[in-house]
Regions:
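Hydrophobic pocket/interface hotspot
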Residues: 28, 42-44, 51, 71, ...
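A solvent-exposed, acidic/Ser-Thr-rich amphipathic alpha-helical stretch
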Residues: 49-98
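Beta-strand elements of well-folded, non-transmembrane domains
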Residues: 110-112, 129
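A short hydrophobic beta-strand element
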Residues: 99-108
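Short, surface-exposed coil-to-beta transition loops
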Residues: 88-90, 116-123
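Short, low-complexity N-terminal intrinsically disordered segments enriched in polar/charged residues
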Residues: 4, 11-41, 45, 152-158
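Low-complexity, intrinsically disordered terminal/linker segments enriched in charged
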Residues: 134-158
């Protein structure tokens, strides 16, 4: 009887973890579709009140934490909207997930303010209380610097 109870408990735990992983993957997949839509505030409902976003890298817009209000009121319209005025199409190529987070690997297709801007991304989502608690965005910051900000590469002579 003890073995039956133990097996039943393991099945319940496994099923609960499996459901939360699938729920997290769905939420992560839906988030950017909503955030980059005509009504990005719909995505705000998926975020935790203490939400934090950080664009990682070595550019002038990198490593600045944005809370929920700053992400939706400033980052999306004033940074993304101005650099990619015609929007961006993001295609998910893979997801890696567990019960605490999801890494979403994506390819982007966009016209930036200085021409074609097709980058590759990894968005790392962490969850708390069934909501998106944080997102860290990784991409080619070299491409951001050269295609969006017109920075030039300089050869360093030895």
């Amino acid at each position: 009887m003890k073995q039956f109870v133990y097996l039943f408990a393991v099945i319940i735990v496994f099923t609960a973890c499996s459901n939360s992983i699938e729920d997290n993957k769905k939420m992560a997949g839906d988030f950017l579709d909503l955030a980059l839509s005509a009504n990005p505030l719909e995505a705000q409902e998926l975020t935790h009140p203490d939400f934090k976003f950080v664009f990682m890298g070595n550019t002038e817009i990198s490593n600045i934490p944005y809370d929920r209000d700053a992400y939706f009121d400033y980052w999306l319209p004033q940074v993304v909207g101005k650099l990619l005025p015609t929007g961006i199409t993001l295609t998910t190529t893979d997801m890696i997930a567990d019960e605490n987070g999801v890494a979403v690997i994506m390819e982007g297709d966009a016209e930036g303010i200085n021409g074609e801007y097709d980058n590759k991304y990894v968005f790392v989502y962490k969850f708390k209380d069934g909501k998106i608690f944080s997102i860290h965005e990784y991409n080619s910051d070299l491409l951001v610097a050269t295609r969006l900000y017109k920075n030039e590469l300089v050869k360093i002579s030895k």
